[in-house]
Regions:
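Multi-pass, polyprenyl lipid-linked donor-dependent membrane glycosyltransferases
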Residues: 69-70, 81-95
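Alpha-helical transmembrane segments and terminal signal-anchor/GPI-anchor hydrophobic tails
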Residues: 1-11, 26, 123-246, 280-292
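Transmembrane helices and adjacent periplasmic/lumenal helix-loop junctions
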Residues: 112-128
Length: 292
């Protein structure tokens, strides 16, 4: 992010638009370049904006806001919002556009801005416009049947049949980061997807909860799992898309009554993500560390 800020300081607005990578994010930084602590002020501003937009957008979408805050804080607040600043801001903009703003034009403006800040948010936006605004259960069923065919594209990337320079760069970045952490990054995230799979199966298996499969949140959680396992050989992309889907999975869980299963699931989710946070921070506590 310091490189982004350097570009914001060095280049003019027109140069940023024409020549700099991720111009929308850099233009947001440009506003803060006039002060001595511009970079720090920008990070504080983004942190406030991200939390405000996310909390505001889901407030009327969940049954138990306390459960949402608990699940959100165990992962996103500690890891995702702190480390992946750009994608977190993009997701916040998309969420406020999809969930909270009633005006269609203004909603579309926030959604498009979010996608321009980080292209990964195109995935939930695609699902939202395909099925998320529909009450037609048949459309959801067709969507679930067709989605695995779409995943042949990321599978082709991960198997080497297709190539793209940013994917190659992501792989280099991930391998370097994982080497610095002694291989921990390769193992760290696998428990959370497994837990999400269990949660989705539980919702489908329970008759009282099965109607939730015909919701946008269930659909994007389903997509996140499929993309994660189909792109596992490109870990940065797999984890990034899955992280986005996990936010909506948390929304889905927060709509349910706090029975013993939801409580157990929430505690397991929090414990696993506290472990992941400790690993990222470099702590090696035997109770939390299950091997490298």
């Amino acid at each position: 992010y310091k490189e982004y800020y350097h570009n914001a300081v060095t280049y003019s607005v027109s140069e940023i638009i024409l020549n700099v990578q991720d111009p929308v994010f850099v233009l947001l930084m440009k506003v803060f370049t006039g002060s001595k602590y511009g970079f720090d002020n920008f990070l504080l501003f983004v942190a406030f904006l991200t939390l405000f937009f996310k909390m505001t957008s889901v407030f009327r979408r969940v049954e138990n806001i306390y459960l949402f805050v608990f699940l959100y804080s165990s992962y996103y607040l500690c890891v995702h919002d702190y480390i992946q600043v750009r994608v977190s801001l993009a997701l916040a903009l998309v969420c406020i556009g999809m969930y909270w703003i009633p005006n269609k034009k203004m909603s579309l403006f926030f959604i498009i801005t979010g996608c321009l800040v980080h292209l990964s948010t195109i995935i939930p936006v695609f699902v939202y416009y395909v099925v998320g605004r529909s009450d037609n259960n048949l459309r959801y069923k067709r969507f679930y049947y067709m989605v695995p065919l779409v995943l042949l594209i990321p599978l082709a990337f991960s198997m080497g049949f297709l190539s793209y320079y940013r994917i190659d760069r992501y792989l280099d970045y991930y391998n370097q980061a994982s080497d610095k952490k002694g291989g921990l990054l390769r193992n760290m995230p696998l428990l959370v997807p497994a837990l999400q799979v269990i949660g989705l199966i539980y919702i489908y298996a329970r008759k009282k909860l099965r109607q939730n499969i015909f919701t946008f949140e269930y659909a994007i959680s389903y997509i996140g799992i499929l993309i994660f396992y189909s792109c596992i050989s490109i870990p940065v992309i797999a984890i990034r898309i899955f992280d986005i889907s996990t936010f909506f999975f948390i929304v889905l869980i927060s709509r349910m009554k706090c029975n013993i299963y939801v409580i157990f699931f929430s505690l397991a989710f929090a414990l696993i993500n506290i472990r992941n946070t400790l690993i990222l921070l470099g702590y090696n506590i035997p109770f939390f560390h299950f091997g490298s």
